[in-house]
Amino acid sequence: MLKYAAAAPAGLGLGTGLLALAPPRADAAPLGILLDYAAGVIGAGDLRASGALGAIRYVSDRRPGGAWMLGKPIQLPEARDLYQNGLKIVSCYQYGKQDTADWLGGQNAGVAHAKRGWQLHVAAGGSNGAPIYASIDDNPSYDQYKSQAAPYLRGWEAVLGHQRVGVYANARTIDWALQDGLGSYFWQHNWGSPQGFTHPAAHLHQVEIDKRNVGGIGVDINQILKPRFGQWD
Protein backbone atom coordinates (compact mmCIF):
# COMPACT_ATOMS: atom_id res chain seq x y z
CA MET A 1 0.00 0.00 0.00
CA LEU A 2 1.32 3.42 -0.94
CA LYS A 3 1.38 5.85 1.97
CA TYR A 4 0.96 9.23 0.31
CA ALA A 5 1.61 11.22 3.46
CA ALA A 6 5.08 9.71 3.76
CA ALA A 7 6.10 11.66 0.67
CA ALA A 8 5.33 14.99 2.36
CA PRO A 9 7.65 16.76 4.81
CA ALA A 10 6.46 16.89 8.39
CA GLY A 11 4.26 19.84 9.22
CA LEU A 12 2.72 20.26 5.79
CA GLY A 13 -1.07 20.63 5.69
CA LEU A 14 -3.57 17.87 5.10
CA GLY A 15 -3.63 16.89 1.45
CA THR A 16 -0.07 17.96 0.63
CA GLY A 17 1.22 14.43 0.03
CA LEU A 18 -1.42 13.70 -2.58
CA LEU A 19 -1.04 17.10 -4.16
CA ALA A 20 2.63 16.38 -4.70
CA LEU A 21 1.79 13.18 -6.56
CA ALA A 22 -1.25 14.32 -8.53
CA PRO A 23 -0.75 15.76 -12.03
CA PRO A 24 -0.49 19.56 -11.79
CA ARG A 25 -3.01 22.02 -13.20
CA ALA A 26 -1.63 24.68 -15.47
CA ASP A 27 -4.05 27.43 -14.46
CA ALA A 28 -4.22 27.29 -10.64
CA ALA A 29 -3.12 25.20 -7.71
CA PRO A 30 -5.78 22.78 -6.43
CA LEU A 31 -7.22 23.35 -2.98
CA GLY A 32 -6.81 19.74 -1.91
CA ILE A 33 -7.52 16.17 -2.91
CA LEU A 34 -10.54 13.89 -2.59
CA LEU A 35 -10.45 10.16 -3.27
CA ASP A 36 -13.21 8.18 -4.94
CA TYR A 37 -13.56 4.41 -4.71
CA ALA A 38 -16.12 1.61 -4.87
CA ALA A 39 -14.30 -1.62 -4.00
CA GLY A 40 -14.51 -1.19 -0.24
CA VAL A 41 -14.73 1.12 2.73
CA ILE A 42 -11.68 3.15 3.76
CA GLY A 43 -11.57 4.14 7.40
CA ALA A 44 -11.00 7.73 8.44
CA GLY A 45 -7.55 6.93 9.78
CA ASP A 46 -6.29 5.53 6.48
CA LEU A 47 -7.99 8.28 4.50
CA ARG A 48 -6.43 11.00 6.64
CA ALA A 49 -3.00 9.32 6.51
CA SER A 50 -3.17 9.36 2.71
CA GLY A 51 -3.27 13.15 2.79
CA ALA A 52 -6.75 13.43 1.30
CA LEU A 53 -9.27 15.93 2.63
CA GLY A 54 -12.10 13.44 2.22
CA ALA A 55 -13.92 11.22 -0.24
CA ILE A 56 -16.45 11.23 -3.05
CA ARG A 57 -18.75 8.36 -2.18
CA TYR A 58 -21.47 6.51 -4.04
CA VAL A 59 -25.13 6.88 -3.11
CA SER A 60 -26.05 4.18 -5.62
CA ASP A 61 -26.56 0.43 -5.43
CA ARG A 62 -24.24 -2.24 -6.80
CA ARG A 63 -25.20 -3.15 -10.34
CA PRO A 64 -25.59 -6.78 -11.48
CA GLY A 65 -22.15 -8.31 -11.72
CA GLY A 66 -20.79 -5.72 -9.32
CA ALA A 67 -20.31 -7.93 -6.27
CA TRP A 68 -16.78 -6.53 -5.98
CA MET A 69 -18.23 -3.07 -5.24
CA LEU A 70 -18.16 -3.58 -1.49
CA GLY A 71 -18.06 0.18 -0.93
CA LYS A 72 -21.44 0.86 -2.58
CA PRO A 73 -23.48 2.52 -1.28
CA ILE A 74 -22.00 4.59 1.54
CA GLN A 75 -23.58 3.63 4.87
CA LEU A 76 -24.27 5.72 7.96
CA PRO A 77 -21.44 4.21 10.12
CA GLU A 78 -18.86 5.02 7.43
CA ALA A 79 -20.19 8.53 6.98
CA ARG A 80 -20.10 9.13 10.74
CA ASP A 81 -16.51 7.89 10.89
CA LEU A 82 -15.41 10.32 8.18
CA TYR A 83 -17.46 13.25 9.44
CA GLN A 84 -16.43 12.88 13.08
CA ASN A 85 -12.78 12.86 12.00
CA GLY A 86 -13.11 16.12 10.10
CA LEU A 87 -13.10 14.63 6.59
CA LYS A 88 -15.26 15.91 3.75
CA ILE A 89 -17.89 13.77 2.00
CA VAL A 90 -19.34 14.34 -1.47
CA SER A 91 -22.18 12.24 -2.92
CA CYS A 92 -22.12 10.79 -6.42
CA TYR A 93 -24.43 8.41 -8.26
CA GLN A 94 -23.67 5.77 -10.86
CA TYR A 95 -25.50 2.46 -11.17
CA GLY A 96 -25.07 1.23 -14.76
CA LYS A 97 -22.03 1.51 -17.01
CA GLN A 98 -21.26 1.34 -20.72
CA ASP A 99 -24.21 -0.39 -22.45
CA THR A 100 -26.31 -0.07 -19.28
CA ALA A 101 -25.26 3.51 -18.44
CA ASP A 102 -27.93 5.35 -16.48
CA TRP A 103 -28.08 8.36 -18.81
CA LEU A 104 -29.01 6.21 -21.82
CA GLY A 105 -32.53 5.99 -20.38
CA GLY A 106 -33.17 9.72 -20.71
CA GLN A 107 -35.53 11.68 -18.48
CA ASN A 108 -37.49 8.77 -17.02
CA ALA A 109 -34.25 7.13 -15.94
CA GLY A 110 -33.08 10.43 -14.46
CA VAL A 111 -36.19 10.66 -12.32
CA ALA A 112 -35.89 7.06 -11.11
CA HIS A 113 -32.18 7.24 -10.35
CA ALA A 114 -32.49 10.61 -8.63
CA LYS A 115 -35.16 9.24 -6.30
CA ARG A 116 -33.01 6.25 -5.39
CA GLY A 117 -29.89 8.39 -5.02
CA TRP A 118 -31.64 10.76 -2.66
CA GLN A 119 -32.94 7.85 -0.55
CA LEU A 120 -29.42 6.51 -0.12
CA HIS A 121 -27.92 9.97 0.44
CA VAL A 122 -30.37 10.69 3.27
CA ALA A 123 -29.99 7.20 4.76
CA ALA A 124 -26.23 7.77 5.03
CA GLY A 125 -26.75 11.09 6.80
CA GLY A 126 -26.19 13.35 3.81
CA SER A 127 -27.19 16.97 4.34
CA ASN A 128 -30.35 18.30 2.71
CA GLY A 129 -28.54 21.07 0.87
CA ALA A 130 -25.74 18.96 -0.58
CA PRO A 131 -25.85 17.97 -4.25
CA ILE A 132 -25.46 14.56 -5.81
CA TYR A 133 -23.20 14.27 -8.84
CA ALA A 134 -25.07 12.37 -11.57
CA SER A 135 -22.68 10.47 -13.82
CA ILE A 136 -22.17 10.80 -17.55
CA ASP A 137 -19.23 8.40 -17.43
CA ASP A 138 -18.77 8.42 -21.19
CA ASN A 139 -17.78 10.55 -24.17
CA PRO A 140 -21.21 11.17 -25.74
CA SER A 141 -21.72 12.81 -29.10
CA TYR A 142 -23.73 16.03 -29.25
CA ASP A 143 -26.73 14.10 -30.56
CA GLN A 144 -26.47 11.63 -27.67
CA TYR A 145 -26.18 14.51 -25.25
CA LYS A 146 -29.27 16.29 -26.59
CA SER A 147 -31.42 13.17 -26.91
CA GLN A 148 -30.35 11.23 -23.79
CA ALA A 149 -27.88 12.90 -21.42
CA ALA A 150 -29.61 16.28 -21.21
CA PRO A 151 -33.05 14.72 -20.60
CA TYR A 152 -31.43 12.47 -17.99
CA LEU A 153 -30.11 15.52 -16.14
CA ARG A 154 -33.49 17.22 -16.43
CA GLY A 155 -34.97 14.19 -14.72
CA TRP A 156 -32.55 14.68 -11.86
CA GLU A 157 -33.43 18.34 -11.59
CA ALA A 158 -37.14 17.50 -11.58
CA VAL A 159 -36.57 15.46 -8.41
CA LEU A 160 -33.81 17.31 -6.54
CA GLY A 161 -34.03 20.82 -7.96
CA HIS A 162 -31.37 22.62 -9.97
CA GLN A 163 -29.22 23.58 -6.98
CA ARG A 164 -28.75 19.99 -5.79
CA VAL A 165 -27.69 18.41 -9.08
CA GLY A 166 -24.04 17.94 -9.90
CA VAL A 167 -22.73 16.58 -13.20
CA TYR A 168 -19.81 14.14 -13.57
CA ALA A 169 -18.75 14.40 -17.21
CA ASN A 170 -15.98 15.32 -19.60
CA ALA A 171 -15.17 18.94 -20.41
CA ARG A 172 -17.23 19.01 -23.59
CA THR A 173 -20.33 17.63 -21.88
CA ILE A 174 -19.89 20.12 -19.04
CA ASP A 175 -19.85 22.88 -21.66
CA TRP A 176 -23.10 21.62 -23.20
CA ALA A 177 -24.75 21.32 -19.79
CA LEU A 178 -23.78 24.89 -18.96
CA GLN A 179 -25.26 26.11 -22.24
CA ASP A 180 -28.52 24.34 -21.36
CA GLY A 181 -28.54 25.55 -17.76
CA LEU A 182 -28.23 22.03 -16.35
CA GLY A 183 -26.38 21.29 -13.13
CA SER A 184 -24.99 23.53 -10.40
CA TYR A 185 -21.79 21.59 -9.69
CA PHE A 186 -19.37 19.99 -12.13
CA TRP A 187 -16.88 17.17 -11.68
CA GLN A 188 -14.70 16.66 -14.74
CA HIS A 189 -13.29 13.36 -15.94
CA ASN A 190 -10.75 13.14 -18.74
CA TRP A 191 -12.36 10.66 -21.13
CA GLY A 192 -12.88 12.81 -24.21
CA SER A 193 -11.52 15.97 -22.55
CA PRO A 194 -8.62 17.77 -24.26
CA GLN A 195 -5.33 16.64 -22.77
CA GLY A 196 -4.22 18.89 -19.95
CA PHE A 197 -7.43 20.95 -20.00
CA THR A 198 -9.50 21.72 -16.93
CA HIS A 199 -12.90 23.28 -17.54
CA PRO A 200 -13.09 26.63 -15.70
CA ALA A 201 -16.54 25.73 -14.34
CA ALA A 202 -15.34 22.46 -12.78
CA HIS A 203 -15.53 22.20 -9.01
CA LEU A 204 -13.64 18.89 -9.03
CA HIS A 205 -11.31 17.25 -11.55
CA GLN A 206 -10.55 13.53 -11.65
CA VAL A 207 -6.89 13.46 -12.63
CA GLU A 208 -5.86 9.84 -12.01
CA ILE A 209 -7.69 6.51 -12.01
CA ASP A 210 -6.84 2.96 -10.96
CA LYS A 211 -3.19 3.54 -10.07
CA ARG A 212 -3.03 3.68 -6.26
CA ASN A 213 -4.34 1.97 -3.14
CA VAL A 214 -5.27 3.28 0.29
CA GLY A 215 -6.08 0.79 3.01
CA GLY A 216 -5.93 -1.97 0.40
CA ILE A 217 -8.64 -0.31 -1.73
CA GLY A 218 -8.05 1.04 -5.23
CA VAL A 219 -8.65 4.78 -5.42
CA ASP A 220 -8.95 7.56 -7.98
CA ILE A 221 -7.53 11.02 -7.32
CA ASN A 222 -9.59 14.18 -7.67
CA GLN A 223 -8.44 17.76 -7.31
CA ILE A 224 -10.63 20.28 -5.47
CA LEU A 225 -10.88 23.44 -7.57
CA LYS A 226 -13.39 25.61 -5.72
CA PRO A 227 -14.04 26.19 -1.99
CA ARG A 228 -17.62 24.93 -2.28
CA PHE A 229 -17.50 21.68 -4.24
CA GLY A 230 -20.65 19.91 -3.07
CA GLN A 231 -19.44 18.70 0.31
CA TRP A 232 -21.93 17.73 2.98
CA ASP A 233 -22.46 20.53 5.51
How should each PLM-predicted stretch be described?
Residues 23-27:
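Sec/Tat signal peptide C-region and signal peptidase I cleavage site
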Residues 29-49, 174-233:
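Functionally critical loop-and-helix segments that line ligand-binding/catalytic clefts
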Residues 33, 37-42, 57-144, 150:
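Substrate-binding cleft of extracellular glycoside hydrolase catalytic domains
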Residues 48, 83-84, 157, 161:
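Anion (oxyanion) recognition and catalysis
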Residues 162-175:
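Aromatic-lined carbohydrate-recognition surfaces of secreted/lumenal glycan-active proteins
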